[in-house]
Amino acid sequence: ALAEAEIEYAEDPCHSIYVKFRVTDDKGLLTPMGADLSKTYFVIWTTTTWTLPANVAICVGPEFEYALVKSGDEYYVMATALTESAMQAAGKTDYEILGTLKGSDLEYMKTAHPFIDRTSLVIVGDHVTLESGTGCVHTAPGHGVEDYDVCHNHYPEIPIVVPVDSHGKMTEEAGQFAGLTTEEANKAIAQHLEDTGALFALQKIIHQYPHCWRCKKPVLFRATEQWFC
């Protein structure tokens, strides 16, 4: 384990991945706009593909505007302000916005995890920004401080899943990816998403990522039980 003061940031190549989570309960708000729920998806964005087995929620900004976007025979939910860049990342030029809703309206909609038999609940959080991605934040409280805080403090019913062990390998909770290192899981998960049609877009980018100040290797964040005396 590392203290916060022992973490430094360095440039790291990674995949910028957009993933489709199919809507299973729209609270009766998307279908009146013309959406076919069997083909309607929240599109999340992440640069840590290996954390997707830990996803239990999708977080949106309560005051942001979100669009229902139609392209071909599919429908996507994403922040209106990021629609153009997200569709461009997917190479989609022919699309239309059917309607908009506030992020707070989306709270408690339900989606299906793309490769694990589990519901990913739509929640709201003030940490969501419109700087990049889709405004629909992949939420894995087992692997992120902000994710943990919003779920632990406001949605205690959401489970905290940590499918990575202390050696940096995926556990049985990661399903078919059990036994892989996180680096191996990045590639395997991206390939599986593409094979199953759940991949919206994939790009290679360079970003700032936390590294250990001693060994200079990327840091993995895990929620673990703690004891204090």
Label each PLM-derived region with a short phrase.
Residues A1-P53, E65, Y108-A112, R118-T119, ...:
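Residue patterns forming the tRNA-binding/recognition surfaces of aminoacyl-tRNA synthetases
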Residues V60, G91, L193-G197:
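Generic secondary-structure transition motif, activating predominantly at the C-termini of alpha-helices
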Residues A57, F64-C136, V145-D149:
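Protease-associated
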